[in-house]
Amino acid sequence: MSVIIQVFSDYVCPYCYLGEIALQRAAEATGAIIVHRAYQLRESQLQESGPPKLAPGGERMNAIWENTIYPMANRLGVDIHQPSRSPLTRLAHEAAAWARQLGVLDLFQRQLFNAFFIEDRDIGELSVLKQLAWNVGLNPNELEKVLAEHQMAEEVEEDLMIARTYNITTVPSFVIAGHVLSGVQDESVLIKAIKLAIAGELGAEALKLPHLPVNIARS
């Protein structure tokens, strides 16, 4: 029996980037199937102007990076840098939905995270998304058409609707057998949850699993 892990994440969330490592390892160890779903931390600002609420450089955000994100990245051996921008990610999610349709979602997501957290590029810009598409063997001009026509908008909206169904307001969030685990989870925690789900016992044990406060809430 293969357990499905629904993962809600956003490409501007450093914890989502770092959490991918434990997630992939847990899936490999158990045979679980990962289903990535879109979540927009700045969805409420899509029609607003002014500086983003998740803008880097403030005292609070700097403290989070110094006290939490960098130490976690060091433990995992992951290269990550605090970005200088906080773009809207709707186009990135639509591009990712298109990449999933073409069977290269994992590669494209890796490109998105690397572009933002290592290269400090604006993944809300069409030109950047086209370059990332090219990097994974996709046609950048076709992507431009897909995004201009919002061909994948319905898929993204469906993910956001599912997130609301589970009352998800922070990322990363994992849904396993109908139960939500919030925040970055250790590989061992995910493996335990998957095994409990296979045994049909996750309902009784879900509340005993740690819900780590290592996540980011929607602004």
Where is each model-derived feature located?
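Short, intrinsically disordered, charge-biased short linear motifs at domain edges
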Residues: M1-V3, R60
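Structural alpha/beta surface segment adjacent to cysteine/selenocysteine redox centers
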Residues: Y17-E119, E205-R218
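C-terminal cap of thioredoxin/glutaredoxin-like
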Residues: V3-S9, Y15-G31, H36, A97, ...
